[in-house]
Design a protein with these regions (language model features):
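Membrane-interface loops
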Residues: 22-111, 156-172
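C-terminal membrane module of polytopic membrane proteins
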Residues: 130-172
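N-terminal transmembrane-helix/juxtamembrane module of multi-pass inner/ER membrane proteins
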Residues: 1-11
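Hydrophobic, membrane-inserted alpha-helices
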Residues: 12-16, 94-101, 119-126
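Aromatic-anchored segments of alpha-helical transmembrane domains
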Residues: 39-47, 118-129
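Interfacial helix-loop-helix junctions of multi-pass membrane proteins
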Residues: 53-60, 83-87, 122-148
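Active-site His/Glu-centered metal-binding helix of metallohydrolases
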Residues: 11, 94, 135, 139
Length: 172
């Protein structure tokens, strides 16, 4: 579960965007807009209401990522790349849900489609089991991603599209 937690943002998110760029440009644009809008909505929440994850609450939970992978989430190098007090909303889960839905909509195989729909719940399990989020954080992440989807869709509707130019025919 530790590796899933780490891979969710570092590997799967960019991989899904690249896959959708090649498979379905409209789905790529929807996912990209949702991710960006969700970030825009969530950053002020992180700044206004810093919330520690369970592993920092001194409640007896062990930081399984540090103990099982050797990566310390508390090191000065690691904390320079992420805010350890940004537990609510859980964007790991919010993003995993929208990634799963977007990729599921783009794949044809029903088994892969079903598997991608499970991506969000699997990441939800991983973030709780690794002591990085409470269940409330998961719900807040899903709500944030839903609002991000709505905001991203609204911005896309308001953005004028430039017409696609046909290549000029060569004249002899």
């Amino acid at each position: 579960l530790n590796h899933l937690y780490l891979a969710a943002q570092l590997v799967v998110l960019p991989g899904a965007l690249i896959f959708l760029w090649h498979r379905s440009k409209p789905m790529y644009e929807r996912l990209r807009n949702t991710i960006l809008a969700t970030w825009v909505l969530s950053i002020p929440i992180y700044a206004a209401f810093p919330v520690a994850p369970p592993r920092l609450a001194h409640s007896g939970l062990v930081d399984t990522i540090t103990t099982q992978t050797g990566l310390s989430l508390d090191s000065s190098l690691t904390t320079s790349f992420y805010n350890e007090l940004a537990a609510v909303p859980s964007l790991h889960v919010g993003f995993a849900v929208v990634i799963g839905m977007a990729v599921a909509a783009a794949v044809r195989n029903p088994v892969f489609r079903f598997a991608w729909l499970l991506w969000g719940p699997v990441i939800g399990l991983a973030v709780v089991a690794t002591g990085n989020h409470y269940v409330f954080d998961i719900a807040a992440g899903v709500v944030a991603a839903g609002l991000g989807y709505l905001l991203g869709a609204a911005v896309a509707r308001m953005t004028p599209r430039s017409p696609v130019r046909e290549p000029a025919l060569a004249r002899a």
